[in-house]
Amino acid sequence: LVTLRTVQCNVASERLDAVAAQVFRLSRGGELPELLRSGKVFINGRTVFDAGHVLKSGDIVSVRGCGRFVYRGIERETKKSRFFVKTEIYC
């Protein structure tokens, strides 16, 4: 049985590095690029090396050693043009 926990994140864009860094509490400049370079980041089962990959609603993002989440899309935009995005983390 799979349990999903819904989490809202405040991000600047729908880029993979922005959302994954918020969900897994990783550094966008240090830890996440290293995971991308070493081939430990997957979207829908395919290895991704591009930090700028734009996520689409329904994408399943998996990071080895951190976990997996389903990206559900933008909930709303803030006054400062940032986005609240909805994700569901596998527990």
Language-model segments: which ranges?
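Ferredoxin-like alpha/beta domains used as RNA- or RNAP-binding modules
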Residues: 1-24, 47-50, 54-91
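Short hydrophobic/aromatic patches on the structural cores and recognition surfaces of FHA
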Residues: 31-32, 41
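Generic alpha-helical secondary-structure signal
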Residues: 19, 34-35
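Residue-level marker of positions within ordered structural domains that often coincide
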Residues: 25, 37
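Short, well-ordered loop/turn sites that connect or cap secondary structure elements
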Residues: 35-36, 55
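Short, structured beta-strand/loop micro-motifs enriched in basic residues and often containing a Trp
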Residues: 38-46
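Helix N-cap / loop-to-helix initiation motif
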Residues: 27-29
